[in-house]
Regions:
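Bacterial Sec-dependent N-terminal signal peptides
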Residues: 1-22
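Residues that line or immediately flank small-molecule/substrate-binding pockets and catalytic motifs
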Residues: 8, 12, 162-163, 244
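Generic, well-ordered alpha-helical scaffold segments in large soluble proteins
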Residues: 11, 158, 228-231
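Zymogen propeptides/activation segments of proteases
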Residues: 21-85, 89, 93-97, 341-343, ...
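Short, solvent-exposed secondary-structure boundary motifs
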Residues: 30-38, 114-119, 352-358
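Juxtacatalytic substrate-recognition/specificity segment
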Residues: 49-174, 182, 192-193
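Acidic/His/Gly-enriched intrinsically disordered linker/tail segments
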Residues: 128-129, 145-150, 165-231, 235, ...
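Beta/coil-rich, acidic/histidine-enriched accessory regions frequently appended to metallopeptidases
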Residues: 248-416
Length: 416
């Protein structure tokens, strides 16, 4: 995400829209323009409004967004009505259901802004104008799908950054967690997200060993956030943002909010990964059935097996045991060698019921009259203390700090 916060003085201009309850904030970038003239780059003559939004499109489109001039031989049309309606739906959901905006927000008085650029740039941005009101910027090539997935993601950023704009939270000063959260917010309004953007899930299955908050996974993995939402309610994620402090990361804030020790946090993260295997969440159960139990960490070795990639901090391996033991057995036993780990089993019965072992269990007993298909061993890296995942800088971008790995090996035995 490109955090667009354009600093301005505390003095601002505003335009009161006719018959609109909320006002329109005039960003510093637009104040030198005649916004009433259709010859200006941005003009109220090329805009539409809802109760909560103003959508503006650049001069190059002309007045008809369904039939604008081509740019470098490329069509520039988009469905303005669908864009308006979908973003308004997202707005209501993020405000009312997820509580990313609370009473007293500047968004109570001012409309968020959707700016459609006459450009072939494939990048969309969500943030705020002048650190004052939520806004997003997009080109037509990102708003061609009827579901407007890109808009849900970017409006998520607008709401995230409205929190510091309202001075009700620092939200850690920025981190990859913003991208994870926008993917989660998109997933909430589109339960079919895993299908629409399946490449993210396929990539994540190859990278589950990566540390939580690792930048390689920030677009792939809203699943821990979903787990936290299951545990504490959907509105808890926005509250996490409000409670965030500069100098913390989301894990530190989360532990402080819920008064958790490092051991408790590791146990809870492991439980979340057990649930992830079969997508046992309160959200999108039907839509995730085709992706349930598709994790399969590669292993190597002889009698003692080890994963191809050891887990990093809070990263995990989901090792499918179907070809390693006889699933008709009633009991399974684990021998594991390694330090600072969380491990245990997840069995999925043939009638799609999940059976979880305790944390650090070395035995798994199949419930009576049940048969398994499949059985998983879950192993997670569990650091004794939490520390920041280093963000890339100009100095370390090509050679980032190497993260801790948690090596282990294991054997599985099945008994009748």
């Amino acid at each position: 995400m490109k955090r667009i916060i354009l600093l301005a003085s505390c003095v601002f201009a505003s335009y009161t829209a006719l018959h609109a309850q909320k006002k329109i904030y005039i960003p510093e970038d637009l104040r030198k323009m005649d916004l009433q003239a259709d010859t200006s780059q941005w003009s109220f003559k090329r805009s539409i409004e809802t109760d909560d939004l103003i959508l503006m499109w650049e001069r190059g489109f002309g007045s008809d967004t369904s039939n604008p001039p081509m740019l470098e031989g490329k069509p520039m049309s988009f469905n303005l009505t669908n864009l308006r309606d979908r973003v308004q739906e997202f707005y209501h959901f993020f405000r009312d259901t997820l509580a990313f905006s609370l009473p007293g927000s500047k968004a109570d008085k001012y409309k968020m802004m959707v700016m459609v650029n006459y450009s072939l740039d494939g990048t969309a941005y969500g943030g705020t104008y002048d650190n004052f009101i939520g806004a997003l910027w997009v080109a037509p090539n990102r708003i061609q799908d009827a579901k407007m997935n890109c808009m849900a993601h970017e409006l998520g950023h607008s709401f995230q950054l409205q929190i510091p704009a309202d001075s009700v939270g620092d939200a850690w000063g920025g981190s990859g967690f913003f991208e994870m959260t926008s993917q989660w917010m998109l997933w909430q309004v589109n339960p079919g997200w895993l299908t629409d953007e399946n490449y993210h899930f396929e990539a994540f299955k190859q990278l589950t060993h990566k540390a939580y908050l690792h930048l390689d996974n920030i677009y792939h993995s809203p699943f821990v956030i979903q787990w936290w939402s299951d545990l504490h309610g959907r509105k808890s994620i926005a509250e996490l943002y409000r409670q965030g402090r500069i100098g913390e990361d989301p894990v530190m804030t989360y532990k402080r909010m819920y008064n958790m020790s490092q051991k408790q946090f590791c146990d809870e993260m492991f439980r979340g990964y057990q649930h992830l295997v079969n997508f046992d969440f309160n959200h999108a159960r039907k839509e995730t059935r085709q992706y349930a139990c598709t994790f399969d960490t590669e292993t190597e070795g002889g009698k003692w097996l080890r994963p191809k990639n050891y887990p990093e901090e809070y990263g995990f391996n989901a090792i499918k045991l179907d070809d390693k033991v006889n699933l008709n057995a009633r009991k399974f036993r684990l021998n594991i060698q390694g330090d600072n780990l969380r491990y245990g089993f997840v069995g999925i019965t043939t009638d799609d019921q999940s059976v979880y072992s305790d944390v650090n269990a070395t035995e798994f007993v199949v419930p009576k009259s049940k048969r398994l298909s499949p059985l998983y061993l879950i192993v997670m890296g569990a650091p004794l203390q939490h520390y920041h995942i280093p963000m890339p800088t100009d100095e370390n971008y090509k050679n980032p700090q190497k993260l801790l790995e948690f090596p282990y090996s294991f054997r599985i035995f099945a008994t009748r």
